């Protein structure tokens, strides 16, 4: 298993159903590549992909910066986050980016009313600079880091 860090490794959560795996996992894989590329090969500065069922059953993952991909009907984590996170981007009431970045944790929900809208949410998250904003916050120098 590759190394993970509760503060620097981003957890991408997709739904567990066959439909969610078919449509949302490729989006998560693309986003993981974007995150890993920005991490510059540093061990913890990367992303991992897990399904919502595993995320819910693994409390240790809850401390990680989390990005749920897929609609509330197909992703239990997105279902929860969509109810509590503020809306940052919405287009035509079909595509939604919700996020909360504070000292208690970094949580994001990227979803749409269908697969194309969810893809638009993921792309907007990157193109609008929100991914870079997230990574700047979580990957900034920490005084407790030992060099």
Which residues does each PLM region occupy?
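Solvent-exposed alpha-helical segments and adjacent loops
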Residues: 1-147
């Amino acid at each position: 298993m590759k190394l993970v860090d509760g503060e620097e490794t981003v957890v991408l959560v997709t739904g567990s159903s066959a439909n969610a795996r078919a449509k949302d996992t490729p989006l998560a894989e693309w986003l993981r590549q974007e995150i890993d590329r920005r991490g510059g090969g540093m061990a913890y500065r990367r992303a991992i992909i897990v399904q919502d069922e595993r995320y819910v059953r693994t409390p240790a993952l809850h401390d990680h910066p989390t990005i749920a991909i897929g609609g509330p009907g197909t992703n239990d984590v997105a279902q929860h986050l969509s109810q509590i996170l503020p809306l940052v981007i919405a287009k035509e009431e079909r595509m939604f980016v919700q996020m909360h970045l504070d000292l208690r944790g970094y949580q994001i929900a990227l979803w749409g009313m269908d697969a194309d809208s969810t893809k638009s949410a993921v792309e907007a998250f990157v193109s609008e600079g929100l991914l870079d904003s997230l990574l700047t916050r979580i990957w900034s120098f920490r005084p407790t880091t030992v060099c």
